[in-house]
Regions:
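Beta-strand/loop-rich accessory regions of lumenal/periplasmic or secreted enzymes
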Residues: 1-139
Length: 139
C-alpha cells in the first residue's frame, strides 16, 4: 500500500514468502510496498534472520531482484532474479497518485524537505528463537 491507497488495506499479522510480496504486472514496475508497518522479520529456511521495528512506523518492500533489474525488464520473464534478499526500508513513501488518468496526489501526502526524527531497531535471531509470541516482544 501507499499513503493514498492505504484505506483499502487490512491491518494484521502476516507470514508470507518474499515472492508473495510482489505483483506480477504485465509491464514490470515498482510494487510490493508495505505501508505503516510496526515490525517485520526476515529469515531463511533455518529460521536465522533479523527483526526490525521503526519509530514511528515504516514502509518496506522485499524482493529477489534489484530496482535496476526491474527497470531494465520490459516483460516479467526478463527480470533478472537473485538469491539475495533486496530489502528497502523507508521512513515514508511517496503517494502513487494517478496523474496519468486522474488527479495529482493530495498535497498533505507529499514528502517535503525538512527535519524529521526516525529510528529503526534491528535484532538478529537464530533457530526457534522467533515464534508468534516473541515476534511481538523481542524488540
Amino acid at each position: 500500500a501507499y499513503p493514498d491507497s492505504k484505506e483499502a488495506q487490512k491491518v494484521g499479522y502476516y507470514k508470507l514468502p518474499v515472492e508473495a510480496l510482489s505483483t506480477n504486472y504485465t509491464y514490470p514496475q515498482e510494487n510490493g510496498n508495505r505501508h505503516e508497518v510496526r515490525r517485520a522479520a526476515f529469515y531463511d529456511d533455518k529460521m536465522c534472520g533479523f527483526l526490525v521495528s521503526g519509530a514511528p512506523l515504516f514502509d518496506f518492500s522485499a524482493h529477489h531482484y534489484t530496482a535496476q533489474a526491474l527497470e531494465e525488464a520490459k516483460h516479467p520473464h526478463e527480470i533478472e532474479y537473485c538469491d539475495e534478499l533486496v530489502l528497502n526500508l523507508n521512513w515514508k513513501s511517496a503517494p502513487l497518485g494517478s496523474n496519468s488518468c486522474g488527479p495529482l496526489p493530495e498535497d498533505k501526502l507529499l514528502i517535503k524537505p525538512g527535519d524529521f526524527k526516525f529510528s529503526m531497531n534491528f535484532r538478529g535471531f537464530a533457530g526457534a528463537e522467533l515464534d508468534d509470541k516473541t515476534f511481538f516482544t523481542m524488540i
